[in-house]
């Protein structure tokens, strides 16, 4: 009866640890020799089944614990603050504000020279000086009443200008003093002769003859003829 009571308590009792079960088994085994009842058949198979069930339950409890941990971990990820890149994407107004500052600086730089030129008090004086320089490009003021005399005066001025340019070219390419002296000895028309008060302009033939003589004295590579 003691063996039956031990097995019944083991079957229908609460699930405990393995050590308690082994102690119960040992107690049942010790009480069985004193009793005359035969041993219960199938106890080994029942014990094996119980062990398998307990192992399955333990695995289930472990798996459920892992699932809870994963759930808590996912919740913790959701509760984490967003990184700076996500904040930049969600709040683009900050970037626009920072980019607008250099654009404003560039616009101010572009507008400063224009406003300075308009508000400058000497702007009118600069215009006057430029216009006077344009008028003085021919080295005299006004126009002669005689159109032929005006044409002759312009032609003489062009000849003298070419002479100056050639003299500069010779000084740059050649350092021969003889050539410089020959060019300097060429006839040069002064500004007084080109003034409107001049009564008799020089003849065309004399100036053309002097120009051809000057071209002969120059270097053969730079000598040119004028067909006028």
Curated annotation (Swiss-Prot):
<dbReference type="InterPro" id="IPR038794">
    <property type="entry name" value="LIAT1"/>
</dbReference>
<feature type="region of interest" description="Disordered">
    <location>
        <begin position="1"/>
        <end position="108"/>
    </location>
</feature>
<feature type="compositionally biased region" description="Acidic residues">
    <location>
        <begin position="12"/>
        <end position="24"/>
    </location>
</feature>
<comment type="subunit">
    <text>Self-associates (via Lys-rich domain); targets LIAT1 to the nucleolus. Interacts with ATE1; it is not a substrate of ATE1, the interaction takes place in the cytoplasm and seems to increase ATE1 arginyltransferase activity. Interacts with JMJD6 and MRPS14.</text>
</comment>
<dbReference type="GO" id="GO:0140693">
    <property type="term" value="F:molecular condensate scaffold activity"/>
</dbReference>
<feature type="compositionally biased region" description="Basic and acidic residues">
    <location>
        <begin position="90"/>
        <end position="108"/>
    </location>
</feature>
<keyword id="KW-0963">Cytoplasm</keyword>
<keyword id="KW-0539">Nucleus</keyword>
<feature type="repeat" description="1">
    <location>
        <begin position="169"/>
        <end position="178"/>
    </location>
</feature>
<dbReference type="GO" id="GO:0005737">
    <property type="term" value="C:cytoplasm"/>
</dbReference>
<dbReference type="GO" id="GO:0140694">
    <property type="term" value="P:membraneless organelle assembly"/>
</dbReference>
<protein>
    <recommendedName>
        <fullName>Protein LIAT1</fullName>
    </recommendedName>
</protein>
<comment type="function">
    <text>Participates in nucleolar liquid-liquid phase separation (LLPS) through its N-terminal intrinsically disordered region (IDR). May be involved in ATE1-mediated N-terminal arginylation.</text>
</comment>
<feature type="compositionally biased region" description="Basic residues">
    <location>
        <begin position="50"/>
        <end position="63"/>
    </location>
</feature>
<dbReference type="GO" id="GO:0016598">
    <property type="term" value="P:protein arginylation"/>
</dbReference>
<feature type="region of interest" description="Interaction with ATE1">
    <location>
        <begin position="113"/>
        <end position="165"/>
    </location>
</feature>
<dbReference type="GO" id="GO:0005730">
    <property type="term" value="C:nucleolus"/>
</dbReference>
<feature type="region of interest" description="Lysine-rich domain">
    <location>
        <begin position="49"/>
        <end position="71"/>
    </location>
</feature>
């Amino acid at each position: 009866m003691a063996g039956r009571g031990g097995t019944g308590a083991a079957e229908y009792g609460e699930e405990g640890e393995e050590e308690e079960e082994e102690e119960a088994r040992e107690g049942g085994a010790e009480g069985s020799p004193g009793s005359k009842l035969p041993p219960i058949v199938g106890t080994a198979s029942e014990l094996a089944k119980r062990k398998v069930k307990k192992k399955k339950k333990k695995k289930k409890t472990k798996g459920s614990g892992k699932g809870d941990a994963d759930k808590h971990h996912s919740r913790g990820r959701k509760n984490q603050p967003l990184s700076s890149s996500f904040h930049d994407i969600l709040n683009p107004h900050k970037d626009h504000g920072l980019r607008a500052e250099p654009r404003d600086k560039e616009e101010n730089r572009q507008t400063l020279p224009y406003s300075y030129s308009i508000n400058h008090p000497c702007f009118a004086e600069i215009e006057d000086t430029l216009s006077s320089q344009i008028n003085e490009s021919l080295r005299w003021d006004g126009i002669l009443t005689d159109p032929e005399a005006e044409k002759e005066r312009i032609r003489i001025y062009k000849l003298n200008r070419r002479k100056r340019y050639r003299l500069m070219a010779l000084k740059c390419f050649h350092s021969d003093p003889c050539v410089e002296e020959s060019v300097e000895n060429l006839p040069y028309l002064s500004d007084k002769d080109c003034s409107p008060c001049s009564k008799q302009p020089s003849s065309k033939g004399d100036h053309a003859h002097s120009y051809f003589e000057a071209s002969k004295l120059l270097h053969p590579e730079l000598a040119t003829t004028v067909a006028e």
